[in-house]
Design a protein with these regions (language model features):
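A short hydrophobic beta-strand segment most commonly corresponding to one strand
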Residues: 103-104, 117-134, 237-238, 251-267
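A short, N-terminal "cap"/entry segment at the start of jelly-roll beta-barrel domains
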Residues: 1-54, 135-192
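Short, Lys/Arg- and Gly-enriched loop/turn segments at beta-strand edges
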Residues: 109-116, 228, 244-250
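Beta-strand-enriched cores of mature, soluble protein domains
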Residues: 31-32, 73, 92-94, 100, ...
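Short hydrophobic/aromatic-rich beta-strand segments that constitute the beta-sheet cores
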Residues: 86, 124, 166, 219, ...
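A short beta-strand-loop-beta hairpin characteristic of the jelly-roll/cupin
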Residues: 70, 76-97, 203, 209-232
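A sequence-level detector of short linear motifs
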Residues: 15-16, 95, 165-166, 229, ...
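Conserved short histidine dyad/triad with adjacent acidic residue
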Residues: 35-44, 51-71, 94-96, 103-109, ...
Length: 267
């Protein structure tokens, strides 16, 4: 994971490392922590979510693109697939790849030349003007986990038997190429880094959209015991809020961007 701040200068763009707030966890986590919240035996945990105005996605045709902003305010853009190159005037170009994120002001993106390569897919969050805030720190890049081939994009849901199952998640990119999806409301978002850990069978408790930015996560479903492996640029929407749930196995320092949605606003 690499996080940057992009600012426009007269004939160039300035690219600087950006500190972000993130929860760090290492080792195993008791499954009862989640089971008790899902059953109501203990109160829901405070997720310390950061507010977001919206989230949206886009797939880009290879070549130039002029609608990277399409709004106002502070925007956090995440590269899911392919590559995205930014250039201002005669200044040097900067290319972002899966696992890269950049914060920018929408008003500064209009004159920047944007070029997409290799079936580029993006997710963009409208963040608060004061994000990332005083608690932000520079993050380590995490354990490299380059993906080969298409991204693994799944959702895990609870079946009628109270067991969890995977299915494909095409709703992430619902629109034609070069067209942003409709802005979607979310409760908020946060970053987490989990290093080398395990959680036994547990429900997710919340609707949690996870974008993996480093490391490797194995998630095993309780319904058919299928194991899906998520690496940099992969996505899993966990919506098995109750029931038996799933197992998590984390390998390496795994950075994840987590988006939390209400039931009525889920994909």
């Amino acid at each position: 994971m690499q996080v940057f701040q992009i600012t426009k200068q007269q004939d160039a763009i300035s690219v600087s490392p950006l500190p972000v707030p993130s929860l760090y966890r290492k080792g195993d986590v008791p499954a009862e922590y989640y089971r008790d919240q899902a059953s109501g035996a203990s109160p829901r945990a405070d997720l310390n979510l950061k507010p977001a105005r919206f989230v949206r996605t886009i797939r880009l045709k290879d070549g130039g693109f002029t609608g990277l902003a399409g709004g106002t305010g502070a925007l956090l853009t995440v590269v899911i697939t392919g590559a995205l190159t930014l250039r201002n005037g005669a200044g040097p170009a900067t290319t972002f790849v899966p696992g890269d994120l950049f914060l920018s002001q929408a008003e500064e993106l209009g004159d920047i030349t944007v070029t997409a390569q290799e079936d580029c897919g993006l997710l963009q969050i409208g963040v608060a003007a004061d994000w990332p805030g005083a608690e932000a720190t520079l993050q380590s890049p995490g354990t490299p986990s380059p993906r080969t081939g298409a991204p693994n994009i799944k959702r895990v849901y609870k079946g009628d038997d109270d067991l969890a199952y995977f299915r494909e998640f095409p709703e992430v990119f619902p629109t034609p190429e070069n067209s942003w999806s409709e802005p979607r409301s979310i409760r908020g978002f946060r970053f987490m880094c989990w290093e080398d850990g395990f959680i036994d069978w547990h429900p997710e408790v919340i609707n949690c959209f996870g974008m993996f930015l480093s490391g490797q996560m194995e998630i095993e479903s309780s319904g058919d015991h299928k194991v899906e492996i998520f690496r940099t640029g992969d996505i899993c929407l966990a919506e098995d809020r109750t029931g038996v749930g799933h197992i998590d196995r984390c390998h390496g320092a795994t950075h994840v961007l987590l988006l939390v949605s209400e039931d009525e606003a889920i994909w």
